[in-house]
Amino acid sequence: MEIIFYHPTFNAAWWVNALEKALPHARVREWKVGDNNPADYALVWQPPVEMLAGRRLKAVFVLGAGVDAILSKLNAHPEMLDASIPLFRLEDTGMGLQMQEYAVSQVLHWFRRFDDYQALKNQALWKPLPEYTREEFSVGIMGAGVLGAKVAESLQAWGFPLRCWSRSRKSWPGVESYVGREELRAFLNQTRVLINLLPNTAQTVGIINSELLDQLPDGAYVLNLARGVHVQEADLLAALDSGKLKGAMLDVFSQEPLPQESPLWRHPRVAMTPHIAAVTRPAEAIDYISRTITQLEKGEPVTGQVDRARGY
């Protein structure tokens, strides 16, 4: 079995060594320009067109949970990868736990009004504030995939009313499920904290805009953990300035790194992190990839395959 690996920043030697230990019968090599030798599987992130073009691969693994970048490249260069070759994304591989940590910590931060207390501290004001009640602090999750399910599971223990919005109906215990555009308004109307975990598709670009934000309760919060292109940043800022939104926590942006001139840097009710909510953890990624390749070789059913038509 031949496996080729390409990532512009990862330590290729470490990955090659780890994969060969996990798959003793495989020969793994770092792909370099000019390497046209046969391969059965490819592990990639931002691969050049020539790496995959013309290869008769059994499968391609994308070294991340998001596949929008490679799908966009495949649309621009259809010769890059035959449509019959399955494409896999990393399914959880530690990202679920990271998303749980991030989402729970931020929801609790807002629920306990730590943002308000920080503002009071900046004014040197000692002023206990009324508490919020859990019943009025409904959390709505847009996107009900693997990561959305993990976040909902982690928030259940804290007793917040939970709801999710997705393409298909979910039957998660303790979570109200809303489906499609026809139920979006009902989902938003009672959502105090909106958590975005949607995939990046043509249908979801710019979805968090003024029309959507206007349907949230006054004083709502937005937590974006998915993609920056989901948010119309000017609309978000306008909602913050008007008081419609009380706060926003952003891990992703329409342009990264975020330009220094962006008003998001200076807005007092915007907090941010530099796209670190859930990063690839190599050891867990190796475990998932080696396990999935073994299942594929045995003809067993696998999970994590990308639906190219849907975009995730």
UniProtKB/Swiss-Prot annotation:
InterPro entries documented for this protein: D-isomer_DH_NAD-bd, GhrA_Enterobacterales, NAD(P)-bd_dom_sf
Keywords, sorted A to Z: Cytoplasm, NAD, NADP, Oxidoreductase
Pfam families (alphabetical): 2-Hacid_dh_C
Active site location: 227, 275 (proton donor)
UniProt-listed Enzyme Commission number(s): 1.1.1.79, 1.1.1.81
Protein location: Cytoplasm
A GO molecular-function annotation: glyoxylate reductase (NADPH) activity
Main localization of the protein described in the UniProt heading: cytoplasm
NCBIfam families reported for this sequence: PRK15469.1
Record protein name field: Glyoxylate/hydroxypyruvate reductase A
